Amino acid sequence: MAEGQVLVLDGRGHLLGRLAAIVAKQVLLGRKVVVVRCEGINISGNFYRNKLKYLAFLRKRMNTNPSRGPYHFRAPSRIFWRTVRGMLPHKTKRGQAALDRLKVFDGIPPPYDKKKRMVVPAALKVVRLKPTRKFAYLGRLAHEVGWKYQAVTATLEEKRKEKAKIHYRKKKQLMRLRKQAEKNVEKKISKFTDVLKTHGLLV
């Protein structure tokens, strides 16, 4: 991948820890990474156990002044961000710079809805977990521990998918028309295409 190019990853269907480890390595190497659809990230193990773990984490606070930390993020994107932070030397200049190169989002906001999104095969649930194993969704966990925007994110995602469908339909139609147009003029331009082929300008 070219230096300075932004790597846009679709978090849906990836395992939390495995994806976080790969993202942490990439940002340390100097790549800019954007992770979208964090609410679709999976966690191995059944939902109830994962919720108990998170509730235990919520109880960890400073007795005399809880506002001093530790801070418990509720949004799936921030939970993922904190997981990555735990894999970086974030108290050093290098680690802080790496963390600044990471952006995380719930849903797919513009301009990333128009960009090609990648997956990480090494972190995919279907590749890494046995089909019989239980797993939980980060979005559901976040919702049950205090995230307020699950419904809003779902609505916006539905709207985005509808828009994408219309765009794809138009694109297919244009491609069909282009092919038809090429077919219509094929005989007329055959002598020109033959000349171009002899000069190696057309394959």
Curated annotation (Swiss-Prot):
InterPro entries: Ribosomal_uL13, Ribosomal_uL13_CS, Ribosomal_uL13_euk/arc, Ribosomal_uL13_sf. Gene3D superfamilies: 6.10.250.3250, Ribosomal protein L13. Keywords: Acetylation, Citrullination, Cytoplasm, Phosphoprotein, Ribonucleoprotein, Ribosomal protein, Translation regulation. CDD domains: Ribosomal_L13 (cd00392). The keyword Acetylation applies. Its main location: cytoplasm. Pfam families: Ribosomal_L13 (PF00572). The modification Phosphoserine is found at S77. The modification N6-acetyllysine is found at K191. The keyword Cytoplasm applies. The modification N-acetylalanine is found at A2. It is found in: Cytoplasm. GO terms for biological process: negative regulation of translation; translation. Phosphorylation at Ser-77 upon interferon-gamma treatment in monocytes involves a DAPK1-DAPK3 kinase cascade and is causing release from the ribosome, association with the GAIT complex and subsequent involvement in transcript-selective translation inhibition. Citrullinated by PADI4. The modification Citrulline is found at R59, R140. One of its GO terms (cellular component) is cytosolic large ribosomal subunit. It comes from the Eukaryota. One of its GO terms (molecular function) is mRNA binding. Component of the 60S ribosome. Component of the GAIT complex. Interacts with EIF4G1. Associated with ribosomes but is not required for canonical ribosome function and has extra-ribosomal functions. Component of the GAIT (gamma interferon-activated inhibitor of translation) complex which mediates interferon-gamma-induced transcript-selective translation inhibition in inflammation processes. Upon interferon-gamma activation and subsequent phosphorylation dissociates from the ribosome and assembles into the GAIT complex which binds to stem loop-containing GAIT elements in the 3'-UTR of diverse inflammatory mRNAs (such as ceruplasmin) and suppresses their translation. Belongs to the universal ribosomal protein uL13 family. This is Large ribosomal subunit protein uL13. It comes from Oryctolagus cuniculus (Rabbit). The gene is RPL13A.
